[in-house]
Amino acid sequence: MKTTIRNTFARAASVSAVTVAALAATQPASAQQIIGLTTTNALITFDAATPQNGSPLSFISGLEGVNQRILAIDTRPTNGLLYGVSTDSKLYTLNAATGAATKVANLATALNGTAFGFDFNPVADTNGVASLRIVSNTGQNLAVNANTGGVNVQAALKSGGNPIGAAGAAYKDNDANPATNSVGLYVIDSASDGLYFTGAPGAGMLSFVGSLGWNTTGVIGFDIAGVNNAAFAGLTIDGTDTGKSGLYSINLTSGMASLIGEFGIGGNTAISPPLLGLTVAAVPEPESYALMLAGLLGLGFVARRRLPR
């Protein structure tokens, strides 16, 4: 019996280790999970390859004040939590499964605009300084301390010397690894239907990358996956009969937006509201899989060492 128990532990650890190794090997190839923020103040989760198969809506609850709603969302690189900012300029963490909101801080400067880009600067976040970038369709440009709500008001957004707005914003190389992250920021301007880039977000000067190729409204969600720099946008195309939004891939070299599919719930694209924000969900780092693997192998080793023969 003792030998059987020992062998069972060893076999279980071996099988589990193989499973974890296989998961780690296949994870990068799988489509990213995306969390969307709807115009009805709810969260929805879907696979980037099948946006029509969204989860049931999780309506956001727990916001302070009356008739408040979340305007934009992003996943923080250093802790993997989902953050959002409300219409009364308060910062929250959000539970994507339940919609429950937990207040973090009041922003020291009020938001100015009707559409917002909201993204964490991965370099600043790993260095523990003001890391949250908030930009708006009025050209507002804020660097926010996501722990305290402190705000550094920075230069208004411009391109070619002309004022410009931003309805979506996303940093490339957005991960918690100092060896691979960067401060390059892309923004989408729905007024010009263009993609812009800056390597110095605080200066506010943007370079035109290219046209999206679509006439969009101000209802835009935009994010770039940290694992492979795949860029996604939730766009609502102006002048369409449905007024619905869909998931688009964004070419960061040309600016071109290519439709992946309409948003839907459980395959029904007739019942999903447009998205005004989205973020690529946090995924375990390769190091996490390595730790899991080491732990499971250690379990087998301990079982062999401690069980009496």
Segment roles from a protein language model:
Residues 53-64, 102-108, 150-161, 197-213, ...:
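Beta-propeller fold detector
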Residues 9, 18-20, 27-31, 277-296, ...:
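Short, threonine-centered small-residue motifs that mark membrane-proximal processing/anchoring sites
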Residues 301-309:
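C-terminal membrane-anchoring or membrane-association module
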Residues 31-70, 76-79, 251-265, 278-282:
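N-terminal segment immediately downstream of the Sec signal-peptide cleavage site
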Residues 48-51, 95-98, 146-149, 200-203, ...:
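Short loop/turn segments that connect beta-strands within beta-propeller blades
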Residues 33-37, 81-84, 131-134, 178, ...:
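Conserved beta-propeller blade signature
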Residues 42-45, 90-93, 139-145, 192-199, ...:
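Structural motif
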Residues 71-78, 110-128, 164-181, 218-228, ...:
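Structural signature of eukaryotic scaffold interfaces centered on beta-propeller domains
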